[in-house]
């Protein structure tokens, strides 16, 4: 398995080099109708062993400054490509850092906070998700990627929300 090449219709591209590939993708496939971005949550997690929590314990009262470069790259991609819908997903600990750039999140689904432009997702209230489900061994170099999968139920909710969305243009 080289990277995530085993995932159908997946390309592994460097988000920091988006200027090198975004135009080719738009030419090949057209403007995407939807973009989902999930910057790595480690920097923003409130978990005890995460950098943010460690910083707070070691530097009480001092502001934590996470690396926002991936979020900025995603913002640039969305501004350049202008998809009809997009979601930027992260954990609750990202909220104080994302909100100044993206505004408030539009929906919270369990532990997922969603920012962007998308209809509200209809996810069953009894749905549950744990990042530890089918958790690969810690020696797996792709562990973080595999744990970061967007759950199928969320993906299905996005498809349904977008498919059933009626725009004002469609009424005219």
Residue ranges and their predicted role:
Residues 1-172:
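Conserved active-site and SAM-binding loop architecture
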């Amino acid at each position: 398995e080289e990277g995530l090449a085993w995932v159908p219709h997946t390309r592994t591209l460097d988000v920091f080099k988006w200027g090198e590939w975004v135009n080719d993708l738009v030419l090949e496939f057209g403007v995407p109708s939807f973009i989902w971005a999930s910057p790595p949550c480690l920097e923003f997690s409130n978990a005890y062993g995460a950098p943010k929590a460690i910083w707070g314990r070691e530097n009480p009262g001092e502001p934590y400054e996470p690396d926002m470069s991936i979020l900025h790259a995603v913002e640039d991609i969305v501004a350049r490509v202008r998809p009809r819908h997009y979601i930027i997903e992260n954990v609750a600990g990202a909220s104080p850092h994302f909100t100044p750039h993206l505004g408030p999140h539009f929906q919270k689904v369990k532990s997922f906070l969603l920012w962007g432009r998308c209809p509200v997702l209809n996810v069953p209230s009894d749905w549950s998700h744990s990042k530890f489900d089918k958790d690969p061994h810690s020696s797996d170099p792709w562990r973080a990627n595999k744990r970061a999968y967007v759950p199928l139920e969320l993906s299905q909710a996005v498809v349904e929300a977008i498919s059933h969305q009626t725009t004002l243009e469609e009424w005219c």
